[in-house]
Amino acid sequence: MGRTDDVINVAGHRLSTGAIEAVLGTHPSVAECAVIGVADDIKGQVPRGFVVLKAGATGEGLVDELVAAVRENIGAVASLKRVDVVAALPKTRSGKILRKTMRGIADGRDEPLPSTIEDAGVIDALRPTLVS
């Protein structure tokens, strides 16, 4: 498994978000991606994906393809609750994706922005998607 914050618990199954991201990242239209675990009343947590498209790629049919790829490569328990195509992912100046911040906002917490954030405008643009 990887770091503790990269492991989510879906209905009693421990899943690596990194493994799910690896599947999403193999799609030819995906430039970069992130997967977070969001709270779910029934399963505890469910995986939710965010993808940035490569230049010239379209999102038509992409979500269905990504969900199917995760189900095929990892299994139904890892099936993504939702996949959002976004313009950019929030990162630190060193390039680390701010998954903890994304997870907190998605779960409805007032998550402070880390001082190391590269561009606070990215999280501001992503906030409506995270809370919906």
Protein language model regions, located:
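AMP-binding/adenylate-forming catalytic core of the ANL superfamily
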Residues: 1-78, 97, 101-104, 109, ...
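A short, flexible beta-alpha/helix-coil linker loop
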Residues: 5-7, 88-91
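Short, acidic, Ser/Thr-enriched surface-loop or helix-capping motifs
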Residues: 41, 91-92
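General small-molecule cofactor/ligand-binding pocket signal
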Residues: 83-86
